[in-house]
């Protein structure tokens, strides 16, 4: 059976390994009865989901739109919301709406940074591949400079002829 074309993508193995290590550390921090270091719970939620989202976005070699959609689904919905619902079933952890807010803020900031960097990276690759492609504004500037050069040439000719 052939897979649809949108399911053909590469996995960046080194990034996946980093993500798995971060996920194991996050799971330990999220489901441990008490944190080993005294830290604000909301700050911890923010940074954990910021890092997870920052790394997960680059695990699969996808277009910017597909990477964004997959990251929102996995990190935002399953990670940010799902982990809090799982904690509500644990006897030593409690459900906290502000934890979800911190999770989603961390995801959102990392996703925004990833999107901006991805867009910039694609533009740089496009410029390297195709060079500078003139736009309408560039074309108008070239026409104006050509007209100025033509006028200067006519002035030079009129000055040289008596």
From Swiss-Prot:
Keyword Ion transport attached: no
GO cellular component: Golgi apparatus; membrane
Main location: membrane
Residue ranges of the TM segments: 15-35, 43-63, 70-90, 97-117
Compartments in which it is found: Membrane
Keywords (A to Z) from UniProt: Membrane, Transmembrane, Transmembrane helix
Membrane topology listed for this record: Multi-pass membrane protein
Superkingdom as given in the UniProt entry: Eukaryota
Entry protein name: Uncharacterized protein C11E3.10
Organism name: Schizosaccharomyces pombe (strain 972 / ATCC 24843) (Fission yeast)
């Amino acid at each position: 059976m052939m897979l649809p074309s949108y399911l053909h993508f590469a996995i960046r193995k080194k990034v996946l390994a980093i993500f798995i290590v971060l996920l194991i550390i996050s799971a330990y921090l999220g489901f441990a009865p008490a944190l080993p270091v005294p830290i604000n719970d909301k700050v911890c939620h923010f940074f954990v989901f910021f890092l997870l989202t920052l790394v997960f976005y680059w695990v699969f070699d996808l277009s910017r739109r597909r990477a964004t959609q997959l990251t929102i689904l996995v990190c935002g919905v399953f990670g940010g919301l799902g982990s809090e619902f799982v904690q509500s079933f644990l006897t030593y952890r409690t459900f906290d709406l502000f934890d979800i807010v911190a999770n989603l803020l961390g995801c959102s900031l990392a996703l925004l940074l990833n999107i901006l960097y991805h867009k910039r990276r694609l533009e740089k690759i496009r410029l390297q591949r195709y060079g500078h492609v003139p736009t309408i504004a560039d074309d108008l500037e070239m026409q104006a400079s050509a007209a100025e050069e033509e006028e200067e040439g006519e002035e030079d000719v009129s000055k040289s002829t008596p």
